[in-house]
Regions:
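ATP-grasp fold ATP-binding core
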Residues: 131-132, 158-177, 199-214
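Rossmann-like NAD(P)H-binding beta-loop-alpha module
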Residues: 141-163
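A short glycine-rich, hydrophobically flanked beta-strand micro-motif that places a catalytic Asp/Glu
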Residues: 270-282
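Glycine-rich phosphate-binding loop of ATP-grasp-fold ATP-dependent ligases
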Residues: 141, 166-192
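C-terminal active-site "lid" helix and adjoining low-complexity regulatory extension at the edge
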Residues: 279-358
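Conserved N-proximal alpha/beta basic substrate-recognition cap immediately N-terminal to
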Residues: 39-149
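Phosphate-binding site of ATP-dependent enzymes
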Residues: 181-268
Length: 358
């Protein structure tokens, strides 16, 4: 195994190179202003570039050395001021990125987003009840616990509530694992339970049919990032993204997307996430996929189903800008630091006889 070469942006810009003995990381700065838990090249390169511009030390934790970085962090050899978590999976108990996020938080670092809040909101059955309590529009749902699976029987009242066919979703799980879109009976529920053995609850939901808006499916993936809401057209089958323009938002009366996303952010306490929301022929909005905390920022120029490039660039900017405010504050007052730099420069100029005249 060859050593790993790590490049650092920011103060004291230097290469932190691994030795060539196969022992992995051998030289690391004491502290990083910003650490990015793995993202695709386009997005991570943009974050790295911005860190260089803002004078922030930066490290990208790629999968090959995620576990080793956690060990260095736990041993006190590395410190992290801000972690942007784009990769952790709370549904996997041994996921190194989730361990990284929890370790950074435990050691006093700032994590975007809080791993404990993300894990708590990741339980769809519990989060569903929370959304209902706060009047956030979600499909009609019947929640079934795993302990009730053997005795569970769909009643006429339940079928009247969720309709046929209905959607089956595991309460705990990521991606589409265990999701059944054309459920007909208890057998589909048990099939979902077998596919996701670690989920303790399951949701039977009314299947929502989106309306068409001038040939476009009224299905949206909407991003929330520190109070800013960015809606996108998103096709649930092809995964194709297009930004919703201000004109389209006014023309199709899509303003409720912003209100719904801000309500979800308020309830969940999560800063950076996406949700799937659809609009029906009855002009009703429904949140379909409640909360995705590890947003995929793969760019459309590289991946057909990726997000628009301008969205990826903007998200990188907002995240780094927020991280800079936190990192500079933890270094010391930002204005005082700038003032000291100016004084140091003036003193050097005076000593060289080139000080500006007053």
């Amino acid at each position: 195994m060859r050593g790993i070469s790590l490049w650092v942006c920011g103060p004291g810009r230097r290469a932190a190179n691994a030795d060539r003995t196969g022992k992995g990381i051998s030289v690391l700065p004491t502290s990083y202003d910003l650490v990015l838990a793995y993202a695709h090249d386009y997005f991570s390169s943009r974050v790295r570039e911005l860190c260089g511009q803002f004078d922030l030390s930066f490290f990208l934790v790629e999968p090959i050395w995620a576990t080793e970085f956690v060990h260095k962090l736990q041993a006190g050899e590395v410190k992290v001021r801000v972690l942007i978590d784009m990769a952790s999976d709370a549904y996997l108990p041994d996921d190194p990125y989730f361990t990284l996020a929890k370790t950074v938080k435990q050691l006093g670092g700032y994590v975007i987003d809080d791993p404990d809040a993300g894990a708590m909101m990741g339980d769809k059955s519990k989060f569903h009840r929370l959304l209902v309590d706060h009047n956030i529009p979600v499909p009609e749902t019947v929640i079934v616990t795993r302990s009730d699976l053997d005795s569970f029987c769909l009643t006429e009242a339940m079928l009247a509530q969720v309709g046929l066919p209905f959607v089956v979703k595991p309460g705990w799980g990521s991606g589409r694992q265990g999701v059944i879109l054309d459920g007909q009976s208890e057998a589909d529920l048990r099939q979902s339970a077998a596919a996701v053995p670690y989920s303790d609850a399951f949701l039977l939901q009314r299947k929502i049919t989106p309306k068409s808006l001038e040939g476009r499916v009224a299905w949206f993936r909407v991003f929330h990032i520190f109070g800013e809401v960015i809606p996108c057209w998103w096709h649930p089958t092809t995964g194709d993204y297009q930004l919703v323009t201000p004109l389209e938002e006014r023309r199709f009366k899509l303003q409720p997307l912003t209100r719904i996303m801000k309500d979800i952010a308020r309830v969940s306490k999560i800063h950076f996430f996406s949700s799937e929301i659809t609009l029906t022929a009855e002009k009703r909005f429904f949140v379909i996929d409640y909360l995705n905390t590890e947003c995929d920022m793969s760019a459309k120029s590289f991946w057909p189903s990726g997000v628009p490039d301008e969205l990826a660039r903007h998200v990188a900017w907002v995240l780094v800008d927020h991280a800079m405010a936190v990192a500079k504050r933890r270094r010391g007052p930002f204005d005082d630091e700038l003032m000291q730099r100016d004084q140091d420069w003036l003193e050097r100029q005076r000593q060289s006889g080139q000080a500006p005249r007053e």
